[in-house]
Amino acid sequence: MKKAVEFHSEERGEMIRADLYTPDEGEGPWPVVIMGGGWCYVKELIMPEYAKFFLDRGVAALIFDYRHFGESDGMPRQHVDGWKQIADYRSAVDAVSYLDEFKGVLDPQRIGVWGISFSGGHVLAVGALDWRVKCVISQIPVIEGWYNAMRAHGSVGYRELTALVQEERERRYLTGEHRRLPHSGDPKKEVVMWPHPETRPVFEHIKATTAPNHEHESTIASVENVLLYNMRPYLPMLLDTPTLMIVAEGDDLTMWEREIPAFNEIVTTKKKLFVQGGSTHMTMYSDLSHLEVAAVQAADWLEEWLVAPYR
């Protein structure tokens, strides 16, 4: 069953809107996995496909729009701030834990977090900082935003990106207005955030079929936020939280050469690294058979830590 819900963020005037999916069989209170998307995602973008596998294991899914995106509040629109998004995950944990609306429906003692791509990094921080989170699933995560941007753009492309950021910073200071740049595209034709031409067609197809609220652009100011983004300091803080990391073999979008060392820095022995061969970063969205492989790994993890111990 799907139900639209809302809850306030850490800024009480800004509401976060979400879809709550509960299993069709059995009865609550259900364990729940909180799901947020990556760069410029909305809650309808691919996450419900993953959630189907979790529902089959008796785990509810709370899929939310970050502030500044989709149906949630927040200005300017299409503004990506990793730390605000991490705070929105924690506000979702607050809602599950404290709101009467969820009592008897969701079990606040059995909360997991799932993230993909940019949010695959977010959940590592959430798991490290929030003792209420009982397990983490980090899929194809961004670990260090600066490194990813430099590696993806190369030195010449990175010069063009940072020149645009500097130009925009002056303009924004003088006018107060935010301009945008494309989420992805062909860097030979325009400056984009993520210079991977294969990304745009996948997201355009998803927008046309299931996620009409998706806009394939972000504020230029978002670039500065991602350059400051670094999850490595939080990895040693994952002392006892069960953590699954799913990596696409050879991933050159979120850089598997950073993901695997990051996994090794996670302290808990309750951890698992799954390197998915034969898949790319984007086929985990565009190819349902590749999506299923990752989703089953995640569902197994949720069952192991949120379901099986409570039978």
Per-region residue spans from a language model:
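N-terminal cap/lid segment of alpha/beta-hydrolase-fold proteins
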Residues: M1-G28
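Catalytic nucleophile-loop/oxyanion-hole region of alpha/beta-hydrolase
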Residues: F7-E10, K43-I46, F69-G112, L288-V293
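Short beta-strand element of the alpha/beta-hydrolase
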Residues: P29-G38
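Conserved alpha/beta-hydrolase
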Residues: F53-D73
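Alpha/beta-hydrolase-fold enzymes
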Residues: L124-E204
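Short beta-strand/loop motif that positions the catalytic acidic residue
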Residues: L238, M245-V247
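Conserved alpha/beta-hydrolase "acid-adjacent" motif
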Residues: D252-R258
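Catalytic active-site module of serine/aspartate enzymes centered on a nucleophile-bearing elbow/loop
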Residues: G277-S279, S286-R311
